[in-house]
Design a protein with these regions (language model features):
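Phosphate-binding loop of NTP-binding sites
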Residues: 12-16, 96-229, 233-243, 306, ...
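Residue-level signal for inorganic ion chemistry
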Residues: 14, 47, 66, 100, ...
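ATP-dependent carboxylate/acyl-activation modules
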Residues: 115, 121, 327-329, 452-458
Length: 464
């Protein structure tokens, strides 16, 4: 079957997988769909349209339109009057979509790598994909399509020609990982770290560990877990489903036995990192062209996954050295004689400190422009204060901070260093105006905050 079609997703199998009732021309039951979407604007000839009930819009109202656009079949939560094509009646289109994604994934002969963790999911996904692409045709999560709506859509993008899929899985509460991993059924499951994310819902890091490791229950029978040995919580996981966990980390950072580890780590500032990698299959030196020590960890995870999926040392090294940044994730923008480090897609304490460390290697004035971090629970002030301390400890020249909790950045920075030029503002707009009059040629400016603070607007202002 060509890549035009979604293998095994006939009308009959769709109805069966969704636990729904097929209503329409019975002679079409063996028809195979060509795609599956929830956005009516993306419907093409032969597609399945899945109408989702949103807060503002109910996708069911677009059913007549999508049939005109060439949709082959739709799902629906209620019986349709004189529909222009067949449909499957289901109790919940959202639940039906998840069931269909799980069915489709299991019907494919493909190796699936799942990735989760408090920090570094997307950058690790990119590194692993870069490595696997040296041997396989790879499908990967686009953008941040990593939740209970995004993951099934990512799975629907897999075609028969793909040999590996790298799927990012993001959660904020208990039970979500159960549902995500039921759909993805990983052959290799990577957990990057257990940090201070979503503590409003998960309580503490032990809660984060419990929620993240729900994925172990839904891995494929011969699956392996690839874990960061230098994370104290993950280091307590000795076996997964009766098999030893595969660990990676720095040679001297912890006592856990590591299958993949690094020595001779060299920070090249904005030119990236160099490290010596030791694996069961051999050793190699690699130049990672993305700044930040955290990218050495991403590369170790990618090496461990590559070995599990049969890549050679040469292929792994090549993939690590070809990896690139993506927009909004430590992206470097040259503008008006300045360098803007656009890292404002999201933020948490660990990623904040990593980005500040990257900034510290810049020449000229270093300016940290920081906004609030969300979902940190009762420790939110303390965790913001610690990020401020990192600004002082890394000898950052200037701090611009905006937001209610960002006061703690200013306090922490002042506590650690009297040399930091500190500017605090209650709102982003006022801060941006002051920042524009402050910056000059030769400055390097880090812009970082949680997504809800809308700091991409700061990057836009600096770039205009």
């Amino acid at each position: 079957m060509s890549d035009k079609y979604m293998k095994n997703l006939t009308f009959a199998n769709i109805a069966k997988a969704c636990e729904g009732r097929y209503i329409g021309d019975e002679t079409l039951l063996d028809t195979t769909i060509t795609g599956a979407v929830i956005d009516s604007r993306q419907v093409k000839e032969g597609y399945l349209f899945i109408p989702i009930k949103g807060e503002r819009v109910d996708g069911h109202k677009f059913i007549p339109t999508v049939f005109e656009q060439g949709a082959a079949i739709v799902l629906s939560e209620h019986e349709l009057t004189d529909p222009a094509g067949p449909y499957v009646l289901v109790e919940s289109t959202t639940d039906a979509m998840k069931k269909l994604a799980a069915f489709y994934r299991k019907s494919l002969d493909i190796k699936v790598v799942g990735i989760t963790g408090s920090v570094g999911k997307t950058s690790t996904k990119e590194m692993i994909s870069s490595v696997l692409e040296q041997k396989y045709s790879v499908h990967k999560t686009a953008g941040n399509f990593n939740n209970e709506i995004g993951l099934p859509l990512t799975i629907f993008g897999i075609r028969e020609s793909h040999q590996a899929a790298v799927l990012e899985m993001g959660i904020s509460d208990f039970g979500e990982m159960h549902r995500l991993s039921t759909m993805s059924c990983p052959d290799v499951m990577v957990i990057t770290n257990i940090g201070y994310c979503h503590l409003e819902f998960l309580g503490d890091r032990d809660g984060v560990l419990k929620a993240k490791t729900e994925c172990f229950e839904h891995m494929m029978p011969d699956a392996v877990a690839v874990l960061n040995a230098d994370d104290d919580k993950l280091a307590t996981v000795q076996t997964v489903n009766g098999k030893p966990a595969i660990y990676y980390g720095k040679e001297s950072a912890s006592d856990v036995h590591k299958s993949v580890y690094t020595t001779n780590i060299e920070n090249l500032g904005f030119d990236g990192m160099k490290a010596h990698f030791v694996t069961p299959e051999g050793e190699f030196d690699a130049h990672i062209h993305i700044p930040g020590e955290h990218n050495v960890y991403n590369a170790m995870a990618a090496a461990a996954v590559g070995l599990q999926l049969g890549l050679t040392i040469a292929e792994i090294k090549s993939g690590i050295e070809k990896a690139e940044t993506i927009a909004g994730r430590t992206n470097f923008i040259k503008t008006h004689g300045m360098t803007v480090i656009d890292d404002c897609y999201n933020a948490n304490p660990v990623s904040m400190k990593s980005s500040i460390e990257v900034l510290s290697h810049a020449k000229g004035r270093t300016i940290a422009v920081l906004g609030d971090m969300g979902e940190l629970g009762s420790d939110e002030k303390k965790l913001h204060h610690e990020v401020g301390e990192a600004v002082g400890e890394n000898h950052i020249h200037t701090l611009f901070a905006a937001g209610e909790l960002a006061k703690e950045y200013a306090a922490g920075a002042a506590e650690k260093s009297s040399d930091v030029d500190i500017h605090y503002f209650e709102d982003r707009e006022t801060m941006t105006q002051e920042l524009l009059s402050y910056v000059k040629e030769g400055d390097t400016i880090l812009v970082k905050a949680s997504h809800f603070v809308e700091f991409p607007k700061v990057v836009e202002a600096l770039s205009e």
